[in-house]
C-alpha cells in the first residue's frame, strides 16, 4: 500500500506561494487605488495585468488541484473544521476566478482599454453599457471585500492551527520539502 503524501506537490506549493504574493500585492494595490487618487493611474497599470495573471494561474491551479489530491488533514481537525477548510478553499478559488472576470467585464462595459503590457490589450467581453458597468463595479467591490474576509479567515485558521493547536497543518504547504520525523530511539 503506497504511503500518503504529507505535503502538497512541489508545483502546487509553488503556485500557492506565487499566487499568495500576487494576491497580497493586489489587495494592497486595490486599497491604495481607492484612497490615493494621485497614484491611481500607476496602480491601475499594475492592478489590471496582475488580475489577469491571477486569473490564468487560478485556472492552472484548479486543474492541478483536480489532478493531485491534497494530503490528508491532521487527525486533530474535527469534521466541521475540515468542512470549513474545504469551503474556504473553494470560496477562495471561486473568488480568484470570478473577481478578475468581473473586473474585465466592468472595464469592457465602460470601454476602458485593458492594457496588459505596452501594445497588448485584452478584447472587450461585454457590450458598452453604463448601467452594466455600474453594477459590475459594485459587484467587483463587494467580491473584493468578501475575498479579503475569506483570506483573513484562511490566514487566521492557519495561525490558530500552527501556534495554538500545533498540529503541523502548515507543513502541508510550506515551500520546502518536509521530511518525516524519525522516531525517537527507545532505551
What are these language model-derived features?
Residues 1-187:
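Membrane-embedded alpha-helical bundles that constitute the cytochrome b-like, heme-associated redox core
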Amino acid at each position: 500500500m503506497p504511503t500518503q503524501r504529507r505535503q502538497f506537490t512541489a508545483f502546487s506549493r509553488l503556485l500557492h506561494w506565487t499566487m499568495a504574493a500576487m494576491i497580497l500585492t493586489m489587495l494592497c494595490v486595490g486599497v491604495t487605488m481607492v484612497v490615493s487618487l494621485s497614484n491611481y493611474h500607476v496602480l491601475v497599470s499594475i492592478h489590471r495585468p496582475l488580475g489577469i495573471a491571477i486569473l490564468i494561474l487560478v485556472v492552472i491551479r484548479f486543474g492541478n488541484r483536480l489532478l493531485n489530491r491534497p494530503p490528508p488533514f491532521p487527525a486533530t481537525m474535527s469534521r466541521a473544521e475540515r468542512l470549513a477548510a474545504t469551503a474556504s478553499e473553494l470560496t477562495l478559488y471561486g473568488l480568484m476566478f470570478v473577481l478578475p472576470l468581473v473586473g474585465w467585464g466592468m472595464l469592457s462595459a465602460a470601454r476602458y482599454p485593458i492594457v496588459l503590457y505596452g501594445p497588448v490589450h485584452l478584447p472587450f467581453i461585454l457590450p458598452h453599457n453604463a448601467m452594466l458597468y455600474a453594477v459590475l463595479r459594485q459587484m467587483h467591490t463587494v467580491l473584493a471585500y468578501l475575498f479579503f474576509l475569506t483570506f483573513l479567515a484562511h490566514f487566521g485558521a492557519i495561525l490558530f492551527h500552527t501556534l495554538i493547536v500545533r498540529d503541523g497543518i502548515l507543513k502541508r504547504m510550506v515551500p520546502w520539502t518536509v521530511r518525516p520525523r524519525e522516531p525517537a530511539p527507545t532505551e
